[in-house]
Amino acid sequence: MSRTPSSLDKDKGSSEFVENMNEIEIIEHTRVPSDKPSGFGGHLIDENLVKVEGEDKVTPYLCFLISASAIAGFLFGYDTGVVGVALPLVGTDLGGSVLSSSQQEIITAGTTIGAIFGSAILGGWGDRLGRKVAILIADVFFTVGAVLIAASYSVPQMIVGRIVLGVGVGGAAAIAPLFITETAPTAVRGRCIGVNAFFIPFGQVISEAIGAGVQDMKNGWRLLFALGAVPSLFQLILFHYLPESPRILILRGQTDRARHVFSRIYPNATPEMIDYKFRVAQEYVTATTVLQSGTTYWQRTKTLFTKGSYRRSIVTVSLIQMAGQLSGFNTLLYYAGTLFSLLGLTNPALGGLIPAGTNAFFVLVGMTLVDKVGRRGLLMFGVPIMLAGLVWNIVAFHYLCIPTGGLLDTSYKYDTKLVGIVIGGIVFFTTGFGLTYSHLAWYQSEFLALEVRSVGSGIATTANWVANLVVSVSYLTELETLTPSGTYGLYLGFSVVFFIFAVFCYPETKQLSIDETSLLFEEDWGVKRSREMRRERRETQRRLADSEMTEVATAHVQAQKQKDSAVTRSELDNFMEELKNGAKRFPISR
């Protein structure tokens, strides 16, 4: 579909390069939804048609912005890892008796319960509060919760502290990826979201490492939980120097501040380019405001499940979130100390570093590949590795536990070789998980339309925590009733079902702008539509490049005519061929 020049293109303040682009027939995907007000003319402008020099590079300012935001991911990861190494150290400090399996499960699940509320409330109110304020509120809950846990002298007090902490974990998990998605340039958006995803296993590694070092320290578990308040206080300070999301600033009418944020994100852009980036975002926000006008938060939530395109998008991101949890990976962290004690390791906390470190490394690998290979490409490659790892675990645990009736027994010394095979299966499984769900689950904001992005992100993150709750409160019980092999067989069944769903219903978002990706679900689940949109985008870029070549060739011919009027058509064709052969010298963007 060719794009009709919009009022923005005709604006007197628009630069010459925008006007020139209107002379080219451009395939355009980005349109206001079909139920939009008629005043929008049926289309919106594609931000990617104008690319700034160095846009595919991570600038120092963008690095600061993304890193400060990703502390939320670190806090998420630290809490996930710390409970697994801290609970075995509690001993009789909470009520005078050793924690039972059910008490460990309830304490572990406390954060998950709080996170369900945090992601639903802070995530859902992200538009009204703003991304920045929502993250700051989450930091307050983080800090208060960490203090309550570290000062606990009873199981109920610790559970309350874990719930308070969980509100912060859930809220930050919903908002931080959303904030990053809305501020990062499309060319590096995958890597930027990946930083937040990487900080999750990085936090897990740090908690496991510190836990290994305080095994013999009195009240070491209190220190472990108290240290969780340090990153949240640090983020509170850093966010004082960070801007609000430019789209939220536009929504509030703070246009000068929004332009300033764009100029910081794109330091090499000309004023005209900044104006173009700003006006594109402004059109989307204006369209969204009209779509949201007259509706309440609960009405928009209902719309997510009644309108087909919204429903398909929220189902996709929610199921991908749940897939990561129901694979069982977090049980390796929540109960690392218990599991590796059962396997006979003398320092179980060091054993916890195995899945945490492997996950962190392969999240980093996936983060570097995601903008090249694509989200779907990584999923199709990595999940089969994860499934093979689960099969490995099923078989390995079966043979390991034959002497103890199929169950793990701390009083029995298992064969060292078989323990090594089990750990090898855990590493192989974690490799696939790190490449896929560990970070791809947090790309949820890419799939959601702006008008429901905040509430949708909150719902998807809530789905994550509900699945997390199911796993965390049942793992130790499952080991005792289903046996370790049966437990990982259950996780394998879940993972196979979710992978089949992903094959048919998880579209690629690579190369598409944040405001284009939500259009993938307009007609179906978007897998085929994504391929078509990305192919047409490549053709559009090629035509833009050819147009620049033509302009250069014409200027060359005119210069030659001044010297010699005998320039032939064949000479022009030869010159054009030379340009095409050396097209790298003529960038697509202006």
Swiss-Prot record:
Deletion consequences: Simultaneous disruption of ITR1A results in defective mating hyphae, reduces production of phosphatidylinositol and glucuronoxylomannan, reduces laccase activity, and increases expression of ITR1, ITR2, ITR3, ITR3A, ITR3B, ITR5 and ITR6. Simultaneous disruption of ITR1A impairs the ability of the fungi to traverse the blood-brain barrier and leads to attenuated virulence in a murine inhalation model of systemic infection, and the brain infection models by tail vein or intracerebral injection.
One Pfam family cited in the UniProt record for this chain: Sugar_tr
Any single GO BP term: myo-inositol import across plasma membrane
Domain of life of the source: Eukaryota
Membrane topology per record: Multi-pass membrane protein
Induction: Induced during sexual reproduction. Expressed during infection.
Disulfide bonds: none
Ranges that cross the membrane: 64-86, 106-126, 133-153, 163-183, 193-213, 223-243, 326-346, 350-370, 377-397, 418-438, 455-475, 486-506
Catalytic activity entry: myo-inositol(out) + H(+)(out) = myo-inositol(in) + H(+)(in)
Keywords carried by this UniProt record: Cell membrane, Membrane, Transmembrane, Transmembrane helix, Transport
Broad class of where this protein is predominantly found: membrane
Stretches of the chain found on the membrane's Cytoplasmic side: 1-63, 127-132, 184-192, 244-325, 371-376, 439-454, 507-590
GO molecular function annotations of the record: myo-inositol:proton symporter activity
UniProt-annotated location(s): Cell membrane
Extracellular membrane side: 87-105, 154-162, 214-222, 347-349, 398-417, 476-485
Gene Ontology CC terms: plasma membrane
Role summary: Major transporter for myo-inositol. Plays a role in the traversal of the host blood-brain barrier.
Family the entry assigns: Belongs to the major facilitator superfamily. Sugar transporter (TC 2.A.1.1) family.
Protein name: Myo-inositol transporter 3C
Protein species of origin: Cryptococcus neoformans var. grubii serotype A (strain H99 / ATCC 208821 / CBS 10515 / FGSC 9487) (Filobasidiella neoformans var. grubii)
Name of the gene: ITR3C
